[in-house]
């Protein structure tokens, strides 16, 4: 009959921690299954069971008892196996402690997880969203565009090169279509061309541009060999020469705003002087009616005038005089022509007065000769 050992007198030897590890891992796996949604990494905790710790407390007594009963080693071995089989309650309590420990860890984990999650939230508050950054960038671009629009340009040219050519060509076309010079009716010429200009031009701007183009041509014409930097300048000069040249279509360049030229006023003065000469003399020269000397637009009057001979009498070659006369602007030529014609009219008037004076003196001589007695 086997001897039953009292567990108090002969406690079982402390087992290794392998069983506790297995129990703890089983408890950790159970807890991991329940909290898989909260934790991704399984928690492995090693906790020794109380039976193991309590059993490990009196090792000396167990060794003493075991030495006293060395002969009964076989029975002790059987008793140890029986005690191990009777220890499941202690192992169960170890599992319970492991589960409680895991549950405590779970209760502490939400705070740590919330703390870790709170950090990105704080960082996200400091970082500016991409949409807000894009809106700020677009606002800056709009402000830059507005500033670039508000900045005034240095010099804005109203008349383009095409507009200048259009004005010159328009003067030629107006003369060809209407048969009148653009200076005769400036209002009609303005209405004829204003819609073709690239901008809304006023009457004053239109006339100022014509005067500036003529002035530019006169400055070029005074040179022996005018040079041109651009093809536009050369084309403008050729058109201007066709308009304001010696045989241009706008010979009556000195035009007032009402369309009456200085030349017409000078003609009226000459006509009045000639009429007075005719009435004072009692008859016209050679019995013929005095004709108006309005000048021939087809030829240059200077070449056939006495001015060339008078200037040449001072020691200057006639050919050189005529050549230099061709370099004078059309406007200056017209002024000289008008003055020369007025001077000729005054010369005729002086000749008439001189003739009257000589007639009176001759009449006195005749009367004196009649009253003188004849010598015997």
Curated annotation (Swiss-Prot):
Domain of life, per lineage: Eukaryota
Q: Does the keyword DNA-binding apply?
A: no
Compositionally biased spans, kind Polar residues = 87-103
Q: Where is the composition biased (Acidic residues)?
A: 17-40, 73-83
Q: Which GO terms describe its molecular function?
A: transcription cis-regulatory region binding
Q: Which cysteine-cysteine pairs are annotated as disulfide bonds in the entry?
A: none
According to the record, the residues making up region (Disordered) are 1-150
Q: Give residues where Phosphoserine occurs.
A: 49
Annotated keywords: Phosphoprotein, Transcription, Transcription regulation
Q: Where is the composition biased (Low complexity)?
A: 49-72
GO biological process: what's one of them?
regulation of DNA-templated transcription
InterPro entries according to UniProt: GEBP, GeBP-like_C, GeBP-like_DBD
The keyword Transcription regulation is annotated on this UniProt entry: yes
- Gene Ontology CC: nucleolus
Can you state the subunit structure given in the record?
Interacts with DEK3.
Q: Which family does it belong to?
A: Belongs to the GeBP family.
Question: What name is this protein filed under?
Answer: Probable transcription factor At1g61730
Species in which this protein is naturally found: Arabidopsis thaliana
The organism's lineage is: Eukaryota, Viridiplantae, Streptophyta, Embryophyta, Tracheophyta
